[in-house]
Amino acid sequence: MKTIYISGPMSGIEDLNREAFESAEKKIQKMGHIALNPHRFPELETYEDYLFFDLEIIAMAADAIALLQGWENSPGSKRELAVAIQKGIEVMLIA
């Protein structure tokens, strides 16, 4: 069983792309893994607070990162991917 962080675009997308994140979460759970869905994390004050929190979660708890469609247009997803690569964390695409 792996712990998989879900990364994808949020800003500028209706309901912060919640539907795509929840769909990915269900797929990951169906495969028998633990999904780390940022929509389920605590509310924070600023974008920078969210990003710092998310990067720490990836570095400390994730075995893999699952990239949603459109991740390449998201500065936050690019930073999350960079941390995953730096830490040697598995990277996968999820639709």
Question: What do these predicted regions represent?
Answer:
Residues 1-95:
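Conserved catalytic or regulatory cores that recognize and/or transform ribose-phosphate-containing ligands
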